Amino acid sequence: MEEFQGYLELNRSWQDDFLYPLILQESIYALVHNQDLGFNRSILLSKKKGYDXKYSLLVVKRLVIRMYQQNFVILSLNHSNKNAFFVPNKNLYSQRISEVFAVIAEIPVSMRVMSSLKGKERKQYKNLQSIHSIFPFLEDKFSRLNHVLDILIPHPVHPKILVQTIRYCVKDISCLHLLQLLLYEYCNNGITLKGSVSNFSKKKNQRFLLFLYNSYVCECESIFVFLRNQSSHLRSTSYGAFLARVYFYLKLEHFLKVFTKHCRVILQFFKDPFIHYIRYQGKWILASRGTFLLMTKFKYYFVNFWQCHFYLWLQTRRIYINKSLNQPIDFIGFRLSVRLNPSVVRSQMLENAFLIYNGIKKFETLVPTMSLIGSLAKEKFCNVLGHPISKPAWADLSDSDIIRRFGRMCRNLSHYYSGSSKKGGLYRIKYILRLSCARTLARKHKSTVRAFMKRLGSEFFEEFVFKEEKVISLILSRDSSISRRLYRGPIWYFDIFCIHDLASHND
């Protein structure tokens, strides 16, 4: 990638037309396929007797030409018997070129980001990359906010709108025409986060899909972030690379200097951001201290914004106004809500005594028990009512493998949902997995669950014990009552960077 960035630096005189020639370079295909993206690299290999496998520029050019043809017949390799045969595949050429396009289009975007960060010291905290790092912020902020907007990002997006969005960072006309061809080849119905994965064939065009989707979301966020920063006097400059086309940053700095010079008295009033904003996958969450009328105005602003700017018909029912999270919302596998804890204080002044009733808002993160039971029922660990059943698909494995797989699922769930306010739902899920494991083993040995568990004894449950329980009881405190109280509270971990399959075979 650095080689191609240097290539762009040396050719700034024709910087607007640099991308399309890169698509015909052999080395860019080698770069893409060496990144282990899951492709069948043999399609770009030139196989001849007496020669080693090499990436052929002629094959690359033919891929571009054959995209315009009606009959798609390719030469692929059968990995089972290594014999070549002809298989009709209409989309494979476009899949290869779309991945290369995504890699090339990321170059100018990354260069603009790096140029915007020059001269600025940015501390990188690895802990902030954890999924759990956002929940302490929610606990601190959301309990003091009045209203929350729960927004589903609208889709699908028309291909022409995507091309218009990407042209702000990719100015090569030829590449834009190629992008339009790829979009009409696959995405006649628009780009969605989930639906397009099937259109592009799973694990084959995810990079291209994410590039398109992130471009669309970035365009939405650019205008929203500008409005949000206005509420806090435009103090944020972290989105400079993506908002360069608006040319307002010089005005921003000038406005800030003038404001701090002449309006020092009311500067403190605006230090707290007016709106807190969180995005995860296809959902936005906006929280504010404003009134219900103000949040309603924001709701209809977003509706008009998507309809006028992206030509998307957004129904207002896709945006929910929740008053201080009285109704729980789903977010990153948790159920978020704010509960009012009443408290009574007795006060006495001379001979008069009176009671003061006060309510304290408490942010709660709950385990979505019903949705987890539905997932377990889908994978045949229990029925729809939550009653554990055996797992016949694992009955052929050894006893140690069966126990290890069930134990890994319990530990992963305990690790991820350790921050839940109430762990009753988590205990129920772990009970389902333990009993399902016991019934699977009893089914394998043609015995009863009671007899099998009596034979194994306590060794059976050791695999299901989460190690952090022992850490809390042994390290934090030796008092059993204190350790139990600490364990019932939320425990957030900063080493969860992605959510893997719970039944993953990798430790």
From Swiss-Prot:
GO biological process annotation, one example: tRNA processing
Top-level taxon in the UniProt lineage: Eukaryota
Annotated localization: Plastid, Chloroplast
One term under GO cellular component: chloroplast
Keywords, ordered alphabetically: Chloroplast, mRNA processing, Plastid, RNA-binding, tRNA processing
GO molecular function terms listed in the Swiss-Prot or TrEMBL record: RNA binding
A Pfam family this chain is assigned to: MatK_N
InterPro entries hit by this protein: Domain_X (IPR024937), Maturase_MatK (IPR002866), Maturase_MatK_N (IPR024942)
Primary location recorded for the protein, binned into one broad class: plastid
Disulfide bonds: none
Similarity remark: Belongs to the intron maturase 2 family. MatK subfamily.
Job description of the protein: Usually encoded in the trnK tRNA gene intron. Probably assists in splicing its own and other chloroplast group II introns.
Protein name listed in UniProt: Maturase K
Species of origin: Fagopyrum esculentum subsp. ancestrale (Wild buckwheat)
Taxonomic lineage of the native organism: Eukaryota, Viridiplantae, Streptophyta, Embryophyta, Tracheophyta
